[in-house]
Amino acid sequence: ISSHVTIDFLKRNRPGKSVYLVGNSNLTGDFIKAGITLTDENPDIVIVGFDTEMTYEKLNKACNFIAQGKEYIATHPDVNCPLKDGFMPDVGSFIALIKASTGREPDLVMGKPYAYTVDYVTNRIGCKREEVAFVGNE
């Protein structure tokens, strides 16, 4: 859901802004389908999302753009993604690595339990904030 929340945020609050996306092909496809402009050169915003296809080149570009002061948004803060036989590093791990390299935390983090995500869910299902409970995997 965090990818949908991030896309919704961009469309409502950053229309027309270009994005450098750190994300796997599924996430990239979602952003393209939503009409988000993706670029490898001089983006307005860097989005760091779930990426099982991470490369050093992607990471290096993201760190350089973030160090230059580009707006930096993470799709969610989870450090690990649970698997049947353990876990794999998730976006929160990328956030820690990027902070070690650039000294910056994300300007905005989506996903649970952040307010924009709660509002997105309550608006989609038509209920009040106090009627919703989120269950996480961390």
Regions found by a protein language model. Give the residues of each.
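A short, gly/pro- and small-residue-rich
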Residues: 32-33, 56-78
